Amino acid sequence: MKKSLLCLALLASFSTFSANYQAGDFVIRGGLTQVKPDSNQAGISLDGSALPLTLSPEDNTQLGLNFVYFYDQNWALEVLAATPFDHDIYLHDPTGATNSIYNIDLNDAKLANVKQLPPTISALYYFDTASVFKPYLGLGINYTVFFEEKFTATPKAAGFSDLSLDSSFGYSVQLGADYLLDDQWSLNVSARYIDINTQATFNVEDSLNVGGLVGKGKSNVDIDPMVYSLMLGYKF
């Protein structure tokens, strides 16, 4: 008898649980978001001449936030936000050019640090499912702004200064899924590609007085990251 009552109670709890989103539902999500830049290294030029140097940004993980508004059970609008991502940028000098010019080995050295915010607005399409598992596809637009760009101590001593990265405007595509825990709470996982391209500019001065390179440097960086999120959501 006790087992039967328990089964009935469980069935009753499931019967009152809607497995679909409705028009007007608003979901706030929070959790971990990782930005993983493209592994390709960006070339560097000085006054228009290519140098035997490349650079690459590192991954970073921050607190991610999502705000999702549903127009019906299939269509929703999502805004992606996060605390500022903090990327270390590494210099690659396989030929030893910096060592021969400045007597400083900068190969695979931490060149700089930069912060960025990549707010993204996406249209989401949720597939019809009769279960608590809700897969979706998303297409959106992204605007990434870079700030607090700075060289580390060693490159600064070699004359690198005035680092600046242009803001970027591009598209985003994503694949994700919600797992509904009850009427309010859900788990969310997503993977998205964001088209982020920026131009980094900087100055190079002969601060060590060794007859080193002097001029204006430039690098076109195709960051184009994959962005992975694991979040807990609450529906209002």
Model regions and ranges:
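Cleavable N-terminal export/targeting peptides
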Residues: 1-24
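Gram-negative (and chloroplast) outer-membrane scaffold detector with strong preference
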Residues: 19, 23-25, 34-36, 66-152, ...
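Surface-exposed strand-loop-strand hairpins of Gram-negative outer-membrane beta-barrel proteins
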Residues: 36-63, 159-167
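Outer-membrane beta-barrel translocator domains and adjoining extracellular loop/strand segments
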Residues: 40-47, 89-96, 147-158, 200-207
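Extracellular loop and loop/strand-boundary signature of outer-membrane beta-barrel proteins
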Residues: 49-53, 104-112, 156-163, 214-220
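Short sequence motifs at beta-strands and strand-loop junctions characteristic
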Residues: 55-61, 111-118, 163-170, 220-225
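Predominantly the C-terminal beta-signal and adjacent terminal strand-loop region
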Residues: 86-90, 100-102, 182-236
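Transmembrane beta-barrel strand/turn architecture of Gram-negative outer membrane proteins
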Residues: 168-179
